[in-house]
């Protein structure tokens, strides 16, 4: 997949929070129940849904509890390139074994 668009980390965190909240509501799961399912405290879930702040570990725990384990496993498989120059550089360096 080649995508040259950019999104800020804040915008991405907001989107992730909104998607997780929507999934939680679709499944009819309360924050307290999700807390029990995931091990992430309910106040942390509330803060994430409202302020988009959470640790990576807690986000992963929530995502797995809501059925996103497979999507997380493929998250970094397909590279996304910001520019053609970056794409060309990466293609040229595919066979490199070590960094400098």
Question: What kind of feature is each model-predicted range?
Answer:
Residues 73-100:
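Short, charged recognition helix plus adjacent turn
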Residues 51-64:
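Short, basic-rich loop-to-helix N-cap that marks the start of a DNA-contacting helix
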Residues 18-33, 93-100:
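Short basic helix-loop element that most often maps to the first helix and adjoining turn
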Residues 28-46:
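Short alpha-helical DNA-recognition segment
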